[in-house]
Amino acid sequence: MGETAGERALSRVHSVRERIGHSLSAHTNELVAVFSRLVNQGKGMLQPHQITAEYNAAIPEAEREKLKNTPFEDLLRGAQEAIVIPPWVALAIRPRPGVWEYVRVNVSELGVEELSVLRYLQFKEQLANGSTDNNFVLELDFGPFNASFPRPSLSKSIGNGVQFLNRHLSSKLFHDKESMYPLLNFLRAHNYKGMTMMLNDRIRSLGTLQGALRKAETHLSGLPADTPYTEFHHRFQELGLEKGWGDCAQRASETIHLLLDLLEAPDPSSLEKFLGTIPMVLNVVILSPHGYFAQANVLGYPDTGGQVVYILDQVRAMENEMLLRIKQQGLDITPKILIVTRMLPDAHGTTCGQRLEKVLGTEHTHILRVPFKTEDGIVRKWISRFEVWPYLEAYTDDVAHEIAGELQANPDLIIGNYSDGNLVACLLAHKLGVTHCTIAHALEKTKYPNSDLYWKKFEDHYHFSCQFTADLIAMNHADFIITSTFQEIAGNKDTVGQYESHMAFTMPGLYRVVHGIDVFDPKFNIVSPGADMSIYFPYTEQQKRLTSLHTEIEELLFSDVENAEHKFVLKDKKKPIIFSMARLDRVKNMTGLVEMYGRNPRLQELVNLVVVCGDHGKVSKDKEEQVEFKKMFDLIEKYNLSGHIRWISAQMNRVRNGELYRYICDMKGAFVQPAFYEAFGLTVIEAMTCGLPTFATAYGGPAEIIVNGVSGYHIDPYQNDKASALLVGFFGKCQEDPSHWNKISQGGLQRIEEKYTWKLYSERLMTLSGVYGFWKYVSNLDRRETRRYLEMLYALKYRKMAATVPLAVEGETSGE
C-alpha cells in the first residue's frame, strides 16, 4: 500500500535534510564553525563524545546556552558518528532509539544531501578502502522478509514483543469461528512420547470441543475444589479430554473456563494466560560451548565468567518453574534440562572433562559435555571463543546425537548463549524444527569500536567476519530473543543498543548490511535475571551471615603476605573499601578503575581500593589478559599505590564471594563496575542484592538497573576525573552523614526486589516459550522465507569464512 499525501507531507516536514537546511539558514555561522572543525580533523570518523567536544570548542559557552533545545543542537546531539572525507561530512543521526537518518553536508558549498542507508554505507567504506569500491558487493537485507509482518512503531514498545504479537495475531486469527481451528489443531497435536494430552480423537470440531468443555465444567462444579484429577479422569476421557487440564477440580475448572472465554470472545491477555497453563515445555536444551563450563573452580578462567553463573542460576529457577507447572497441570512427567557445553579433556583440575554432571540444587538438570572433533580426533585443550568457528557445524551434529540419547525425545525449547552457542542452537533448532530462543549476553561488535569497518585489522586475532555473520544468522533465525535490559536492544537516548548496532553496518570487501535486524521486531523481549538469593542476600540478615568465613576474608583483604592469591598490602585497614570484581580484559576496564583511583589523591585518603581479577598464580593464555596484567602493574607503580590497593586473584568460591560483598558492606564501602560496555551487569545485581552501594558504567545494562542517585550511581568510564569526583563526593558525604550510605544501600535493595529476581525471570521465560511456540505452530511466524535466505548466507558465506580460521594445534597454547 502506498503512502497517503498526508504521510508524504509529514515525512517532508520532518526530513533530516530540511532540518539541517533550517539550521543552516538560522545558524549559518555556528554550523560552519562546527563543520569546519570537523573537516579540519581530516579524513576519519568521529564518535559522539568527539563531536560534542568539537561543538564545545567551536561555540562559546554563552552561545551554546542560546542554542539549547534548538533543532541545531538536537541535530548534533543526535549524531552517533560523523564520517569526514573533506569537503564532505556525513552524519548518522538517531532522533530516537531504533530510528536512523543519514545526511551529507558539503562544507565548502554548504550543500545538504539526504542519504539512503546504502549510500551512507558506501560513503563510509571510503575510510577503509580509500575510494569507492565499484565491484559488486554482497548486500544483506532482511527487511523485505518482514515487510508484511506487524511491528510496533513506538520506542517504548521495544522489548515487549509478546504483548504486541498477542494483540495483533489474536485479532487476525480469531476474528470468526472458522479462524479458531488452528487453536483446536494445536491442542489435538499435544502429546509427549506417545502419550496424548489435552484432547483425544473424540474432539473433531469446535462445536464438539465447546460442548465437551461445558459438560466438563458442569461435572467439576459438583466436586470439592481439591478433588484430584485421578477421580474425574475417566469422565474427562469420555468427553474427549486428556491429562493436562489441571491436577485438581479447581485448577482444571479454571483452565476450562479460560478456554471457553477464549472461544467466546478472544483477547490477548486470556490467550497468554491460557497458554501459560497448558503443558508445552518439558525438555529444554541450553547451548554454551566456549570456555570452562562447570560448577566450581572455573570462574576467572579464560572466557569464563558471568555467563556460566547466569546459566546455572537460570536452570535452577527454570526447573522449579517447570516442576510447579507440570504438577499443576496434573501430569506425571519428569522434565529434563540439558546444558550442552564443550568437553575439555585437558580440564586443569575442573570437571570439564566429565561427560555428564548433575547440577547442584536440581533434580533433573545436567551439564552434557560434547567434545570438538577434527579428522585427527578429539580436541583436548581450551580454545578461545574467537577461534571456535571451524568446529561448530560438526559439533552440532554430535550434539544432536547426544541429546537424542539423553532425552529420548526432541527438546521443546532450545536456548543459545553468546555467538557460538546461538549459532549451534540455530542449526539445531533448524534441523529439529524446535522453538529457538537467543540470549546474546554480549555482542562483540559493540565492544570493539569500528570492528566492522576495520574488520580486516581485527581478523587474525578475533575472526569477526565469522562472529558477526553468526550473530546475524542467529538473531534472524530465532523465534524469540531474550535480553536482560532495554539497553541491550536499543540503548538509550544517547547510546546505541547492541542489537541496534546490527541494523545497518558494513564490512568492506566482505558484505554490506543495509537491514540486519529490526529492534522493533516483536521477537524481542526483556526478561531480567537476578542473583542466587541463597548466596547473595542483604548484609542486614545477620542470622544467615557466614561469619565463619570472616577469618578467610580478612586474610584475603588485609594480610601482610603477598603471594599467588594477593599482591600489595593495605596500610590503613580501617578505611572503607572500593571493591570491584571482573575478568581482566580491555572492555571490563579494571585497569581504568586503578588509573581513576591513582589520579585522585583525595579518593586515596578516603578509601582503599580492592580489585579481584586475573590470576597471579599462572601466566594467562589470553593475549588481551596478558596486556592488561602488565598494564595493571605499571599503573600501580606509576601512581605509587602500594599501601592503598589490594590486587586479589580471581575468586571462584561464589559462597565466599557473597559474604565478601557483605563484609565490605560492614565496612561501609562501595562496589564499582567500570566497564566500557556491560551488556547486563550480574556483579552489579549481586552487589546490590547484598546491600552494597554500587557505582556502575553508564554504557549498557547497569544504566538501566540503577536509578541514578536513588539505588546507586552511573559513572562514565571515559571520564575518569568525573567518576572519581563522584566517589569522593559520596564517601565525603557518608563521613558527614552516615545515614546517606544506608539510604543508597536500601535504594539498591528495593530496586532488586521490584525487578531483578530469578522467580520472575523463570515465570516469564516459560510463558514466552509457550506463546511463541503456539504462534509458530498456528501462523507463518516461523518465517520460512527468512530461513531460506539464512541457509544461503550460512552455506555460501559463513562456511567459507569459518574454513579460514586456523584449527588449534595440540601442544601449542591457543590464543598465543
Swiss-Prot record:
Claim: Transcription is one of the keywords in the record: no
Entry's Gene Ontology molecular function annotations: sucrose synthase activity
Superkingdom per UniProt: Eukaryota
Catalytically driven reaction(s): an NDP-alpha-D-glucose + D-fructose = a ribonucleoside 5'-diphosphate + sucrose + H(+)
Entry annotated with the keyword Glycosyltransferase: yes
EC number(s) from the headed UniProt entry: 2.4.1.13
Broad enzyme group: transferase
Gene Ontology BP annotations: sucrose metabolic process
Tissue expression as described in the entry: Abundant in developing endosperm, low in aleurone, and undetected in coleoptiles and roots. Also detected in crude extracts of anthers and in immature embryos.
InterPro entries: Glyco_trans_1 (IPR001296), Sucrose_synth_GT-B1 (IPR000368), Sucrose_synthase_pln/cyn (IPR012820), SUS_EPBD (IPR056736), SUS_N (IPR056735)
Database matches in SUPFAM superfamilies: UDP-Glycosyltransferase/glycogen phosphorylase (SSF53756)
Cross-referenced Pfam families: Glycos_transf_1, GT-B_Sucrose_synth, SUS_EPBD, SUS_N
Keyword list, A-Z: Glycosyltransferase, Transferase
Annotated region described as GT-B glycosyltransferase, given as residue ranges: 280-757
Quaternary structure, from the entry: Forms homotetramers and heterotetramers with SS1, all three possible heterotetramers are formed.
Family that this chain belongs to: Belongs to the glycosyltransferase 1 family. Plant sucrose synthase subfamily.
Function field: Sucrose-cleaving enzyme that provides UDP-glucose and fructose for various metabolic pathways.
The name this protein goes by in its record: Sucrose synthase 2
Organism: Hordeum vulgare (Barley)
